[in-house]
C-alpha cells in the first residue's frame, strides 16, 4: 500500500498523531511518500528586504508548521517508520513568467498577509508589484526548497 502526500503535512496541527495514525492504517511493508516545504527556504530578489521579511514572516502563519521538513524524519521514526529516503526538491524560477509557481504564490501570499502583522493592502500590493516589475526588468529570481521523504512501515 502506498500513501502519497504533497504539501499537506505542514498544515496538520497534530502532526505526530497523524503520523501515528498513518502508521497504524498502512499495511505491513506499506510506504509513505511525503513532500513538504520548509518556508524558511524561500528566496525572492527584492529591492526592499525589510518589507520582504515582514511579508514572509506573516506568511509563516499560513501553516501549522512552516518548517516541518527539519523534524519530519525524526517524527516519522518515532511513529514507527523506517526513513528510506530524504531528498531536496528545489523550485527555481530564474525569470518571471505568469505560468510559474512563484507568480501564483505571489497572489496567495498577498491575500493571506493583508491585515496581518500590520501589513495593509497597499504594502502587500507594493510587495507584489516590486516582484513583478523586477521580472519585467529581467531581474527576477525565485527559489524554494521542498523536501521528499520516503518512509516504510516496519514489519
Where do the protein language model's features map onto the residues?
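Core SAM-dependent methyltransferase catalytic element
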Residues: 79-82, 144-155
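A short glycine-rich, Lys/Arg-flanked "PGG" loop and its adjoining helix->strand segment in the class I
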Residues: 16-31
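Conserved catalytic/acceptor-binding region of the Class I
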Residues: 31-97
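Short, small-residue-biased leader/transition segments that mark boundaries at the very start
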Residues: 1-2
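Residues lining the SAM
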Residues: 5-9, 35
Amino acid at each position: 500500500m502506498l500513501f502519497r502526500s504533497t504539501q499537506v503535512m505542514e498544515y496538520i496541527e497534530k502532526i505526530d498523531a497523524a503520523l501515528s495514525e498513518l502508521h497504524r492504517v498502512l499495511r505491513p511493508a506499506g510506504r509513505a511518500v511525503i513532500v513538504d516545504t520548509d518556508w524558511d527556504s524561500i528566496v525572492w530578489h527584492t529591492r526592499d528586504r525589510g518589507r520582504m521579511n515582514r511579508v514572509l514572516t506573516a506568511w509563516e502563519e499560513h501553516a501549522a508548521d512552516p518548517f516541518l521538513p527539519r523534524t519530519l524524519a525524526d517524527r516519522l521514526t518515532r511513529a514507527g517508520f523506517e526513513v528510506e529516503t530524504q531528498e531536496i526538491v528545489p523550485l527555481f524560477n530564474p525569470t518571471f513568467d505568469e505560468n510559474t509557481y512563484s507568480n501564483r504564490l505571489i497572489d496567495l501570499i498577498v491575500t493571506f498577509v493583508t491585515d496581518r502583522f500590520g501589513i495593509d493592502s497597499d504594502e502587500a500590493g507594493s510587495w507584489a508589484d516590486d516582484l513583478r516589475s523586477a521580472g519585467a526588468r529581467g531581474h527576477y529570481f525565485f527559489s524554494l526548497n521542498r523536501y521528499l521523504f520516503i518512509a516504510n512501515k516496519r514489519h
